[in-house]
Amino acid sequence: MTTAAYVHRVEGFGTVTVRPVEPERDAPLLHGWVNEERAAFWGMVGTTVEQVRDIYAHLDSLTTHHGFLVSLDDEPVALFQTYDPEADRVGECYEALPGDIGVHLLIAPGTAPQPGWTGRLLTALVAFALRDRTRVVVDPDTANEKAIARMVRAGFELGPEVVLPEVDLPEVFIPEKKARLAFLARR
């Protein structure tokens, strides 16, 4: 069992625990999440449990990209990925600064039942991402107005609209995406 990378108590919300994805252990759970149509931009709709395991085993071997399973009061609620923007397609669309960290967040199906739930979770995850970095970069789809509004409420400054190039690797295919960059600097 992997030790938690980060534990953050959010008053009135619960204890958020962030731990590295364990590909063998977590693949069945993540498979269900990334195969939903709402997760299409993760590029894994139609994958098998074994393919999800292999993708996260590959991710685990990288020094630039990291996958984390997020739990709230010991219940898995999200998949959180961090990455070095210069080693990712987003790095082709803006000038990355030293200390930047990119993040992707996938909320588990059936969670976030109360207004403000995702915002409280995001507060803990941003604190985790900014422990040793100075700025978080996100790239939600331009059509995802809900996610963009959530980022603004969380204090992110909107950046330009960009087109992220497609990624076609043996492990995953991610189509070209129109994205709205947003940035949150550590205060």
Predicted ranges, named:
Residues 1-24:
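Conserved N-terminal entry element of GNAT/NAT acetyltransferase domains
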Residues 24-31, 49, 53:
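An amphipathic alpha-helix signature
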Residues 32-46:
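Helix-loop element at the rim of GNAT/NAT acetyltransferase active sites that forms part
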Residues 46-67:
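Active-site rim helix/loop that mediates acceptor-substrate recognition in acyltransferases
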Residues 60-102, 106-111:
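Acetyl-CoA-dependent GNAT
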Residues 114-131, 149, 153:
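Conserved acetyl-CoA-binding loop-helix of GNAT-fold acetyltransferases
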Residues 137-148:
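Conserved beta-strand-loop-alpha-helix junction that forms the acyl-donor binding cleft
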Residues 139, 157-180:
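Conserved catalytic-core motifs of GNAT/GCN5-like acyltransferases
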